Structure formats: C-alpha cells, structure tokens
Amino acid sequence: SMRSGHSLAFQEFEEIRSKIKISPSKPNDARVIKFLKDNLITTKAVNKAFLISWEAKSEWGEENQNGNSSGESILVPIEVSKTEGKIVRSVGYTEAIQVVSLYKILGDGTLIIYSEYSHICTEERIWFISNNLRSRSSVTRSLDSLAILQTSYASEIRSLKK
C-alpha cells in the first residue's frame, strides 16, 4: 500500500508505505472468541470475523525513531441489510481504540465506513479499480466544528503468492 496523508491542522504531508494482510479468522482463534464474548456478539459470528495486520514505514516517525509502526485489528461485520451494517473493530483506523463503525455498500461496489470517536469522526471510502488494485480515501473531521483535520488517499496493490 502506498498512502499519502494531508494533515490540514498541522499543514503537514505524510507518505506511508505499508504491507497489509487481510485474512479470515480461524474458527478456534481464542483472541477472536474472547473479543466476541467481551462485546456480547454471538460466537457464531466467528465465521464472519477477519484479521487485518499491517507494517508501515512513515516519513513522520511518530511511532518510534525509525518511523515504523505495526498492528493488528479484529473486525466483525454485523449485517443489518444487504448493503448496510456495523463493523466492530478491536482497533480503529484513526484512533488506536475499539470502535463500532457503520458501513454502507453503494451500487457501484464502493464501501463507505463511518467511525465516531470521542472528539473526531472518520469517513473511509474503499473501492476496487481492478481485481488487484484497491483505492481508499479518508476524511477526518472534528465532531465539535466538523472542520476537516486530515485527508488521505491510498493505492493498495494485492500481492498474490503462489
């Protein structure tokens, strides 16, 4: 993944290169089962849960001196209708805390994910340009004033291992 981030509040630009892995959870993954139980989600949802892990290198170097960060999040989609629902995340996209996000799938296949935290909200848009090329954009706003704090755009190329 190659992502550019624009922090409007700090008038900064960030370039990030990431390795992202998305995989379905295993039915016996103890971390996922605990996450489901802690959030009062039926353990039948373990079949829908998936894991996202990432390793990123950034120019800003916020995480440590060499600018590397990594992490993992459990995501559990809860369908409300064919095109809408919730995603319970163990770690959010913008804040490193648990969050319940709303999602909507548009007619063209674009996935919109809306997350609210204590003082900010984020809207992500994810769409596939081809089978192996995904684009993602996000806008982070202040909940108080709705001022735009940050925008980002990512191109993510699927790596197929043989």
Language-model region placement:
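Soluble ligand-binding/transfer domains with enclosed cavities or grooves
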Residues: 1-162
